[in-house]
Amino acid sequence: MARIIGIDLGTSNTAAAAMEGGRATIIPSAEGSSIGGKAFPSYVAFTKDGQRLVGEPARRQAIANPEGTVTAFKRRMGEDYKFTLRGQEFTPQQLSAFVLQKVKKDAEAFLGEPVEKAVITVPAYFNDNQRQATKDAGRIAGLEVVRLVNEPTAAALAYGIDKAGKEQKIMVFDLGGGTLDVTIMEMGKEGTFDVLSTSGDTKLGGTDMDNAIIEWMVSEFKKSTGIDLSADKQAAQRLKDAAEKAKIELSTTMETDINLPFISAGADGPKHLELKLSRAKLESLVDSIVKRCGASIDQALNDSSLKSTEIDKIILVGGPTRMPIVQKYVEDHAGKKIERGIDPMECVATGAAVQAGILTGDVKDVLLLDVTPLSLGLETLGGVTTRLIERNTTIPVRKTQVFSTASDNQPAVTINVLQGERPMAKDNVPLGKFDLDGIPPAPRGVPQIEVTFDIDANGILNVSAKDLGTNKQQHITITSKTKLSDDEVQKFVKEAEKFADEDKKTKERVDAKNEADSVLFQTEKALKEHGDKVPQEDRLNIDRALGDLKEALKGDDVERIKKAKDDALAASQKLGEIIYKESQAKAQGAAGPQPGAQAQGQPNDGGKEDVVEAEVVDK
């Protein structure tokens, strides 16, 4: 099988690896080691004469060419956003492709053979749009992306590949330049890597720490000179480089000097920035950023149903985890010492190469079971999100459920696909929508629309809808852009907790109305067919109860609606007896759901999903 390389396409740095002699080997950058070690900086630049630079050469000239240089474009993946470099516009996918093209070229020089396929890592909390954008970047670079792997999962593969035969529960704490992922995994004796849960924040990383240092530097310089450097583009790149360098140095020393000569000029001549930054001061600057990591640790543990005492090993991934304050915070918060001896800058690329080896057969007896980070569902009657796939479900996965129409003679249904944890559709991310039309005229609840959600091993979603009566089918691969920013996706789980009471009340109200409306519809339908057989007194009671139910449905009093529904059911008991006796007399006893029957989406004995009545929104 053709060679497949593993790539860690990072916000700040990018690294690649390949299986050589049964072991994963880091592919060196053509320019040699840089600030990221064997990884190279994720920078792209265009010079005045139109030359394109990628990696260390782009970073080195960034100070002199701020308008032609860009980095951290990974934070915009999956968004409708364009960067302007010397008058030219580039999407995040294009810029990422330039980085991947360099990886491809370096790999071919190192391996001495063409490279056309790759496994690329992504943050575990990347949504569907961001994953699609990453695959597109690979295609632009001339690489077939055979698999996307979550970054913490790749790190665990790198850690555990030579520890087969040991059962361990592992927490991977992955704090990179732009994102945080916390993943809980179970490593089995038979070489299985089973992801139990994942949580994270797509807008939290080392870049935020750099910005905190820059703000301090700008503030100190303004105090001493009265000059504000925050709007100076050329100074901005020098400040960024100095902040990153100081942050790295203070991981091993207690104090560092920051010297930026000729950073600006005043009426009395040139100005130089000369500051001392201690580790204690740095830690005070980034303390609030580091503490934001705690919520993701807690969420991952909670979703895995494990206590911190049940975790055997903690693996740290990403450059910022070299900082003593980060290491101490993770140890204190999780209540366990971290695992030493793992290179946080190279282990993700190494794990990607291991996954590539699994696909080619070079690595034997290893099974990776990853999960989807956010729940997936569709909008149903009343603006409710009906989930088909819960978050932290092992992928690949395929789930099917049967729905029906919301009104009589409804010719089409709209499938509005959603991602998130909130019970109401408006609070979740709309991933895409499509129509299934051509439904033959029929009473509501009679048509059976089979909806299937299918997530592949890359975490990319395909949705299909099929009219079981006509076999007409429509499907969509989710590729649409989210209208929300990355940090808003992460907010969903937190919002679900914060607004739990409000969400619960809204969901109860909608459910109560849907159930009551179903009782009203079924009873009125039965009266049309069998009302002449009901004694007059019983008929009056039924009509009165249905009238009360209609009035209750005009308001939002849940208890009143429930009571009116129960009263209507009790009043129509005689009607039910008449229908049952008539059915017995005809000896029909037909199997399967009756038209419009309300179901709860649980599989029946035959493995099919029951019909959920009147749940798909009208077109």
From Swiss-Prot:
Any one Gene Ontology molecular-function term assigned to this protein's record: ATP-dependent protein folding chaperone
CDD domains in the record: ASKHA_NBD_HSP70_DnaK-like
Domain of life, per lineage: Bacteria
DNA damage as UniProt keyword: no
Annotated spans, Disordered: 584-619
Compositionally biased residues, Low complexity: 585-605
Cysteines engaged in disulfide bonds, as pairs: none
Induction, as annotated: By stress conditions e.g. heat shock.
Family: Belongs to the heat shock protein 70 family.
Matching HAMAP family: DnaK (MF_00332)
Protein name: Chaperone protein DnaK
Species of provenance: Elusimicrobium minutum (strain Pei191)
Name of encoding gene: dnaK
